[in-house]
Amino acid sequence: MRQHNLRILFFLLVLWGVAVACSRREARFRIGVSQCSEDEWRRQMNSEILREAHFYEDVEVDIRTAVDDNDRQAKDIRELIAEGVDLLIVAPNEATPITPVVEEAYNRGIPVIVVDRKILSDKYTAYVGADNYEIGKAVGEYVANVLHGQGDVVEISGLVGSTPAVDRHQGFVKAISAYPGIRLLAVEDGAWLQLKAGEKMDTLLSRFPHIDLVYAQNDRMAAGAYAAAAREGREKDMRFIGIDALSGKDYGVEKVLAGELDATFIYPTGGDRVMQIAMDILNKRDFPRETILGTSVVDRDNALIMKMQTAHIGTLDGKIETLNGKINQYLASYATQQVVLYGSLSALLLLVGLLVAVYLSLRAKNRLNRELSMQKKKLEEQKTQLIQQKELLE
């Protein structure tokens, strides 16, 4: 019975050791990220979120992408809610269809950070993004400057219904309205996509024999518009301006250096700032409800510097990823060593328990043997006395 109890104790100790070792690796917070689309700008933001997460302990980040599908994004958000995330980061595809599901999460007590695009409600915990209206105004002022207040302009907007598309257009129109010599000939919906923007540009080229400047609301659409104009041999007749200013092959900064774009405006991704605010919320620290990220123009004067700085940052990011990978390996090795250590301690405790049990058993056996010997001796003495009495009687 005593050995049976010791076996139970041993298994309980082993389970305790494993539980302690594993519990130190479990995430304390789980953050769900719902991205509306998957492009270079979104990938950059995701990379920044994940990189910043390395600097916090016990955080797990689950990123899902809706690929420009409102229904899919609503489904993604509801799945994250059902899985019990502690905080949601949402970049809405379109404001109207996504607002209800964001409100649903907020009403259930889940903190929600809305990024990049806004919703049609104030039921969110924090917002992080650029001021798209101000970016549109900055583009308008730049256009007025390079055209010297005179010229014919076409605009290729982002997805109709998305707040950045609306705000960038309104800001642009506000700026150029101060210059009567600038005419906005037409606005076409490029849906943020390069191929669709190219198709819309084909239409614009057929409609308007003279265009001085093409304003595309992101660099991918600007590249699509440039390619369409190049097919018609008209790319030298007009200027092209985009928004995003990402570095890398075929991105905005490279397009400026190649002479395809005259300029691109920085649209900061801000993934690191989003993650910092998320951790402030989860740890009950003060945080700003509205964080507006700044912008600036990238043209031929500063594009090379921008490219070099981004390349240097990319190198540092790679080193951080390598270091984080090694840290994870060390932590995994440490956790394994913990399990082995706790298992060894449990085995040692069992061994000590068994030794104690053996010792106590031997003591009990020796005591029993002594008692039996004494009883045997008494019986022998009684037997001898009986024999002697019998002999006397005879």
Regions found by a protein language model. Give the residues of each.
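An alpha-beta-alpha
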Residues: 31, 35, 49, 138-180, ...
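Extracytoplasmic "Venus flytrap"
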Residues: 32-48, 52, 56, 62-72, ...
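Short, solvent-exposed amphipathic alpha-helices that sit
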Residues: 41-55, 59, 135-139, 163-182, ...
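Hydrophobic alpha-helical segments within soluble ligand-binding/sensing domains
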Residues: 73, 128-153, 196-198, 247-252, ...
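Hydrophobic alpha-helical
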Residues: 87-106, 172, 186, 190-250, ...
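Flexible loop/hinge segments that line or gate small-molecule binding clefts
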Residues: 95-134, 145, 152, 158, ...
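Hinge/cleft segment of the Venus flytrap/periplasmic-binding protein
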Residues: 160, 164, 176, 271-346
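Alpha-helical transmembrane signal-anchor helices
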Residues: 327-386
